[in-house]
Curated annotation (Swiss-Prot):
GO MF: DNA binding; DNA-binding transcription factor activity; protein dimerization activity
Protein name: Viral myc transforming protein
Lineage: Viruses, Riboviria, Pararnavirae, Artverviricota, Revtraviricetes
Composition bias, Polar residues: 309-320
Location relative to the cell: Host nucleus
Amino acid sequence: MPLSVSLPSKNYDYDYDSVQPYFYFEEEEENFYSAAQQRSSELQPPAPSEDIWKKFELLPAPPLSPSCRSNLAAASCFPSTADQLEMVTELLGGDMVNQSSICDPDDESFVKSIIIRDCMWSGFSAAAKLEKVVSEKLATYKASRREGGPAAASRPGPPPSGPPPPPAGPAASAGLYLHDLGAAAAGCIGSSVVFPCPLGRRGPPGAGPAALLGVDAPPTVGGGSEEEQEEDEEIDVVTLAEANESESSTESGTEASEEHCKPHHSPLVLERCHVNIHQHNYAAPPSTKVEYPAAKRLKLDSGRVLKQVSNNRKCSSPRTSDSEVNDKRRTHNVLERQRRNELKLSFFALRDQIPEVANNEKAPKVVILKRATEYVLSIQSDEHRLIAEKEQLRRRREQLKHKLEQLRNSRA
């Protein structure tokens, strides 16, 4: 979702044939990073590295709902949990966002937008700088709040475009950081929509602001006041859990939050969750759980059922398979025995036809085959010889017939 900020922006026409940038914007007319204006002559922007977190430093965050601001009747010198969250929002640049120019506040996509729920301030190099800037601005704000409280309360704010601003009185100390956001109060959304957690919970006794807010803060050394602990705390923006409630439950939650929204007894309990966005979250651990779609789960279940049925069939009929194997083996043995008997009888018949081994009942098969070969060759030679003798006798007969015919003709 694009943002409209007060920083000057220029139109860049990238030549995609020669320039292949690492970051692509949804609209080329908007450029969020002023550092890219100095690198317009270069062919390739720098590769994503440790400098990537400088581009995400101090991104503007949307203002909170005015429902909680109207009940900020903080008369004590120490701000409550809701005050601290609003101060962090303002110090991180909440006044730079024009809420009405982004989208409709009643739109569901605006409620579930990534900018509201995760500003990606949990980086490596930006965390230290963010902590330093927030601590300095927090100290400056507290000093100006103590000195110029009445002056800030008497300063008139700009007229709001929607509902009137919070009434003055006990909440005059909060006017210093609320008068700049009065114009954007009409575009705010309900606190129960953005923060689905109930506001009536209380932390354990003795828990610090970091424990109530659910932020990651290092343990501070004991012995200091609450101001020193708040200044030394490491502030980390956490991700809000997505609200999956219906519209009726949202309205009832909004009414309950307005009734129970008090400055000292309304800690916002935030929890970390993983948001699937296009930007890679380097700090999140790798997820090992694999979720399959419904169709794939049905296929896997059907495959398992088929495997179980086949296993049951195999287990239920072991005797049938064994009997079939035994029958096959028995048939094979009978056929093999018959083949061997026929082969033996054929050898015996061949042996009886050979005169050399006819009377030798113990003659081996190899000897029988050799003698049979020799006998066949001898028979073939005798055949050729007899054929030649027959041909000679036929010729002799023809000669004798011709000679007899001549003798008969001479006598006549």
